[in-house]
Amino acid sequence: MKHTPFIAQHRAAGAKLVDFAGWEMPIHYTGVVDEYHTVRCKAGLFDVSHMGRIVVTGAGAESFLQRMTTNDLAALRPMQAQYSMVCNEQGGIKDDIFVYRLTRAGEFLLCVNASNRDKIVSWLTEHGRGVPDCQICDRSAEIAQIALQGSAARGIVAAIGLSQLDQLKIRESTTVQVADAECLAARTGYTGEFGYEFYVYGSADSVWDKLLNTGKSFGLKPAGLGARDLLRLEMGYLLYGSDIDERTTPIEAGAEWAVRFEKGEFVGRQALLIQKQAGLSRRFVGFELLEKSVPRHGFKILSASSPQSLIGEVTSGNLSPLLQKGIGLGYVSPEYAELGTDLFIDIRGKTIPAKVVKPPFYRRPSK
């Protein structure tokens, strides 16, 4: 298995390590729910270096990426990021990504999912052949990635001399020095909490140690992928391989807001327009259980009026520690997608009542 620069720190902290997309990664340290509450109430430090980081540069980079992604890069200012998708010709989602416009003209950083890194590098390289002045470079091995998430993040970065990060608005970024490493610090994350992600261009372990040691007095703890998944589920954030894949489209997945048809041609545009005009055969919804139980990926969604009728499938589900009820995401036939619609979830042969709700299931308190 592959390892991030922080494997020694994970082992020293007693992490339970698992295989995730070919990487040996911490699923938890002290426990998934404990780490979840730490992030919701204080702050957690996540190793997300297993994700892919692709740099696209050159005078032709912007027009190339406009054709390869669904969102509109023209809307991005320097040092700003946007959520976007890479689609195939049929409109299926090859990956959901973050695109950062960096300071120099024609320089972009793409953050892609770990399981899709090789696929996206190959896809971009294939489509980039013959594009004038456009270089595609997989820099995943050179750039580490750390997420500092939670309300205490603001105080932690101030304590290490980075109070200027407080000026960043959501999805903005800037370059900073942490320990002895240059970093791109961004107001981004996958938890729904206030926080930052650090793209580390130098000695990555020194950045991890600096953040963790400084943050201890603020209640900071390392957090694993288990807590990260719970946190993103409560926000209704999509998980590639569970909620979306190449058999689903952005429109079906409720992510049409990340598709800008008006910008012009991009891969998958025509197929998505046809689907939009023809109507959907399924819609992505959130739901909450009305009785105590836990929904899981792959469970069947049934009609409340006719419990023998299969109307959809759960793609993500768990017990929300905050709400103390089962919550989930999934696809249902369009006529069952209205808010408040009653459903049944088949949980190991038992039909558990549920209702359609609009994610996020959790909203961070405004301060």
Per-segment meaning from a language model:
Residues 85-88, 186:
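Short beta-strand segments that buttress and anchor functional surface loops
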Residues 87-101:
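Cytochrome P450
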Residues 1-27, 101-367:
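Conserved, structured C-terminal
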Residues 1-84, 92-94:
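Acidic, proline/glycine-enriched N-terminal capping motif
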